[in-house]
Amino acid sequence: MIQSITSQGLVLYNRNFREDDKLVKIFTEQAGKRMFFVKHAGQSKLAPVIQPLVLAHFLLKVNDDGLSYIEDYHEVKTFPKINSDLFVMAYATYVAALADASLQDNQEDAPLFAFLQKTLELMEEGLDYQVLTNIFEIHILTRFGISLNFNECTFCHRVGQAFDFSFKYGGCLCPDHYHEDEKRCHLNPNIPYLLNQFQSIDFDTLETISLKSEIKQELRKFMDQIYEEYVGIHLKSKKFIDSLADWGQLLKEENK
């Protein structure tokens, strides 16, 4: 069944199909993720809006049993600051890929669409893209069926303690219960505290965010452990971010 809809959408990626055609994956607000066929993409009027991380209102023909089609578009929004910075672009591409991985095709998820859009808008405004990515990662865990409590001890349920995390018990340990897991993570207590704050943060009121580089490195390492242990996905965009740690700093120094 094919139906016509008008929906805001974010282009996740495109890929070549035959000689001059393209398949374009768009996360739509009204109809979830869909694959759209664009014929003669190089000469098409749609060429400007089928690039990754372009946001627009689309007039679409949606097909539940096959490829869908883009009929028209308006109110195009791009992210020039994101696109002009390799590092920000890498993280923006990763959060979009993470949203893609967390959601089945054709499944509507307007809250996730809004959250992804707001994350990109805050990156565009210049807020710390690494921290925004951590916030996105911790929130989207529920889409993978994972719910973690960083607010209280798994054993005594006390709050406000210098928590560590235990993968054995799937939760936090207070100092009185560190001994329950000899292989606990030995985290800086600021890490569980921050993740607890991230879980309840409201992006609509977020104006600034700043963390020391050492804390950001610890957050990145722990989030990688969480995703490896509980989610088990290995995205190309995440591998690229990891490679930035090796050669990205050299690039930054050359551009000074």
Where in this protein do the model-derived segments appear?
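Non-catalytic alpha-helical scaffolds and adjoining flexible linkers that form interface surfaces
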Residues: 1-256
